């Protein structure tokens, strides 16, 4: 016999309610699960890196597209969404902007155009809805 729909909903909502709390006095969401390391090969991490780089390249004034060389570290925190803190190493590619497809791009080989950076991105995500927001980014030359 099938479970009633309401029972399934309750069983789904309880863990979510336990994971996130609201401070009524300040009317803001508090993290119940503080940043913890996660595997850099996690599918959601890869989606967030793709999104962060798309935003980075859109906002960058550089003439060339930057690509991820390596994902260095990833952390996850659960609030009213999933927040991913991701550290990456990126480099300038041989592809000029604007560009929608980076499949044929490779890191820049000309010494005068080579540039590597270390970046930390904070991405808010509801991956099951396809919703991503770049909450912060910090990059420095390597």
Curated annotation (Swiss-Prot):
CDD domains: CY (cd00042)
Stated name of the protein: Cystatin-8
Keywords carried by this UniProt record: Disulfide bond, Glycoprotein, Protease inhibitor, Secreted, Signal, Thiol protease inhibitor
Organ and tissue specificity: Proximal caput region of the epididymis. Lower expression in the testis. Within the testis it is localized to the elongating spermatids, whereas within the epididymis it is exclusively synthesized by the proximal caput epithelium.
Residues bearing carbohydrate: 39, 100
Record's keyword annotation contains Zinc: no
Bridged cysteine pairs (disulfide): 95-105, 119-139
Keyword Transmembrane: no
Organism: Mus musculus
Annotated localization: Secreted
GO molecular function, one term: cysteine-type endopeptidase inhibitor activity
Expression triggers: Testicular factors or hormones other than androgens present in the testicular fluid may be involved in the regulation of CRES gene expression.
Gene that specifies this protein: Cst8
Single GO cellular component term: cytoplasm
Signal sequence bounds: 1-19
